[in-house]
């Protein structure tokens, strides 16, 4: 994008092209996640939290194709897994390049509860059914680190 400096239209196109490429690849990741979840669930009526771990290869592949996103995964709304809380299955690329699972605190009575259903990024996607860009904002509760999203 450095070649676009000084030309707002080219800079805007470069940013738009970057986001388009990432969103296109997220569609590929979503398809892979869907396949892995279906295979993991097998003949059971509902997914379980344990089934969600099957998305690790898709998240790892996505992160391997992109330098900027350092974490990827899926967010499952309340009642999809047969619980009232939903789930976040998120994988982060470490310094070594390997992926580690991030565990979110989804217990409403605990300090540091990650109440994702109240966040604008979750509600916009649920209400529109389309990808959304939110931020930038600092998200402290999500990964116990300050991250710019």
Residue map of PLM features:
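Juxtamembrane extracytoplasmic/periplasmic/luminal helical "stalk" adjacent to the first N-terminal
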Residues: 1-50, 147
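Short alpha-helical segments and helix-capping/turn motifs at coil-helix boundaries
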Residues: 10, 54-60
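Short regulatory alpha-helical segment in sensory/regulatory domains of signaling proteins that mediates
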Residues: 16-18, 34, 59-67, 125-126
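Residues that cap or flank secondary-structure elements
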Residues: 50-51, 113
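Amphipathic coiled-coil/heptad-repeat helices and related helical stalk/stem segments
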Residues: 55-56, 117-118, 148
């Amino acid at each position: 994008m450095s070649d676009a400096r000084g030309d707002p239209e080219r800079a805007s196109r470069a940013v738009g092209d970057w986001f388009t490429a990432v969103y296109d690849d997220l569609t590929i990741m979503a398809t892979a996640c869907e396949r892995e979840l279906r295979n993991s669930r097998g003949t059971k009526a509902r997914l379980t939290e344990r089934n969600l771990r099957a998305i690790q290869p898709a998240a790892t592949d996505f992160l391997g194709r992109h330098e900027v996103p350092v974490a990827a995964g899926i967010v499952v709304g309340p009642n999809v897994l047969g619980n009232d809380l939903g789930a976040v299955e998120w994988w982060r690329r470490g310094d070594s390049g390997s992926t580690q699972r991030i565990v979110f605190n989804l217990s409403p009575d605990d300090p540091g509860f990650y109440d994702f259903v109240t966040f604008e990024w979750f509600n916009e996607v649920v209400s529109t059914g389309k990808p959304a860009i939110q931020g930038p904002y600092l998200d402290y509760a999500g990964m116990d680190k300050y991250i710019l999203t």
